[in-house]
């Protein structure tokens, strides 16, 4: 299952060496920026249902009438949010020059959100059929990769790249929805205002938290687009995607492997959980530090293999970002395993708010002064600040819990 999830991320990543050489840095930057902007609309449509609706389905899974009502209410809510997202997209050309210059690129990229409306990941998670969800994601990415590699042969077809990815998302999303309806015998649509209100209210806190998280994970490129040309965005996106792939390959497997055991240790006693967390931090931190060091030393080779000579400026940016895998590993272990393991998750949204404000502020301050390097520094500062904040919470609040 974990291998399949990693593969879901790596498939589009493996398309990059070909597509980046076809498009070149400038058009690659244009496409990357469009994907970045549409991420906010995707966030709106997901709303928080991946967690809230999953929980609702899981709790009511023995009550078929209730789960059917939740299913159609979430689909309806996502449909309304999709309409709202396209209304926002229609206004963006009047607010953002980049969107006004190439509206088709943003429309084609946004079409992927139609597939997200139909794809009931939250339902499959709620009934604990994550393997089917992972396979559906896998085929979405695989179909998109095959279509892109088959049809995007020259730079002038750059808009076709997001359009084909969107088409694969829509096809697999509709297919997944039909499968769920037939396999689980979901009744015909019956909507009630009460159920619709319930699913919206349940997802609201998670949505707000996701907004703050997006402000320090996604806003860096958004703000970069206010000051930099397309080629600079392309160079940064190239380095950023490599770092994100390393995070997925290094951090995610460790987090998934450790979570059940560390939860068991914390359930036995806070002291045992803290002791085990320290051991994991030492070992996983050392491994992640090695990955960061190798990334710094091998940056020229990695960029040359992935993107070619045309992305040479990405080498320096990748070196600047090389500490990120180490910092993300530590931050993930402290936040996901530490805060949640010790029952201190109520502090997580406050950490997110502080990080969002600091990251956006740093980007707005540093970008005009030192350019794209300011984005790298802001990202590193945000991850470092998360480590410091969560460590402080664990040391102050956690010590009291351990003494009880």
Where are these regions (language model features)?
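Transmembrane helix-bundle signature of multi-pass secondary active exporters and lipid flippases
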Residues: 35-43, 213, 217, 236-260, ...
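Membrane-water interface segments that mark the loop-to-transmembrane alpha-helix transition
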Residues: 1-8, 34, 39, 46-93, ...
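Signature of the first transmembrane helix
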Residues: 1-50, 86, 145, 204-231, ...
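Hydrophobic alpha-helical transmembrane segments
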Residues: 33, 103, 107-110, 134-182, ...
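Interfacial segments at transmembrane-helix termini and the short loops linking adjacent helices
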Residues: 93-109, 297-327, 373
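Interhelical loop/hinge segments that connect adjacent transmembrane helices in multipass membrane
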Residues: 131, 158-165, 174-217, 261-275, ...
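Membrane-interface junctions at transmembrane-helix termini in multi-pass inner-membrane proteins
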Residues: 103, 114-136, 325-351
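Helix-loop junctions and terminal segments of transmembrane helices
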Residues: 46-62, 239, 243-268, 335-341
């Amino acid at each position: 299952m974990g291998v399949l999830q990693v593969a879901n991320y790596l498939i589009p990543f493996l398309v990059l060496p070909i597509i980046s050489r076809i498009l070149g840095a400038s058009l690659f930057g244009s496409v990357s920026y469009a994907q970045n902007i549409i991420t906010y609309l995707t966030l709106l449509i997901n709303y928080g249902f991946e967690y809230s609706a999953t929980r609702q389905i899981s709790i009511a899974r023995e009550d078929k009438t209730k789960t059917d009502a939740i299913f159609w209410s979430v689909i309806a809510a996502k449909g309304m949010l999709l309409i709202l997202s396209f209304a926002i997209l229609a206004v963006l050309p009047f607010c953002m020059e980049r969107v006004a210059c190439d509206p088709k690129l943003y429309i084609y990229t946004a079409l992927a959100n139609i597939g997200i409306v139909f794809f009931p990941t939250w339902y499959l998670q709620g009934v604990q059929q994550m393997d089917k969800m992972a396979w559906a994601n896998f085929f979405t990415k695989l179909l998109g990769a095959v279509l892109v590699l088959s049809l995007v042969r020259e730079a002038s077809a750059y808009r076709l790249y997001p359009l084909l990815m969107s088409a694969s998302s829509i096809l697999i999303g509709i297919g997944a929805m039909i499968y769920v309806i037939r396999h689980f015998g979901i009744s015909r649509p019956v909507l009630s205002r009460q159920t619709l209100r319930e699913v919206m209210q349940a997802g609201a806190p998670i949505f707000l938290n996701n907004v703050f998280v997006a402000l320090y994970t996604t806003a860096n490129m958004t703000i970069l687009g206010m000051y930099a040309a397309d080629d600079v965005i392309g160079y940064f996106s190239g380095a950023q995607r490599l770092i994100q792939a390393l995070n997925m390959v290094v951090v995610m497997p460790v987090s998934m492997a450790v979570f059940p055991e560390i939860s068991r240790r914390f359930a036995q006693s806070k002291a045992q959980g803290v002791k085990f967390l320290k051991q994991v931090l030492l070992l996983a931190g050392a491994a992640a530090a090695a990955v960061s060091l190798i990334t710094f030393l091998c940056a020229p080779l990695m960029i040359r293999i992935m993107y070619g000579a045309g992305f040479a400026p990405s080498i320096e940016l990748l070196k600047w970002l090389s500490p990120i895998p180490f910092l993300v590993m530590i931050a993930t272990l402290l936040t996901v395993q530490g805060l949640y393991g010790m029952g201190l998750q109520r502090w997580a949204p406050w950490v997110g708010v502080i990080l969002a404000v600091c990251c956006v502020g740093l980007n707005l301050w540093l970008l005009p002064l030192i350019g794209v390097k300011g984005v790298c520094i802001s990202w590193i500062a945000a991850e470092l600040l998360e480590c410091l904040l969560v460590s402080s919470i664990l040391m102050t609040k956690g010590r009291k819990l351990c003494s009880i």
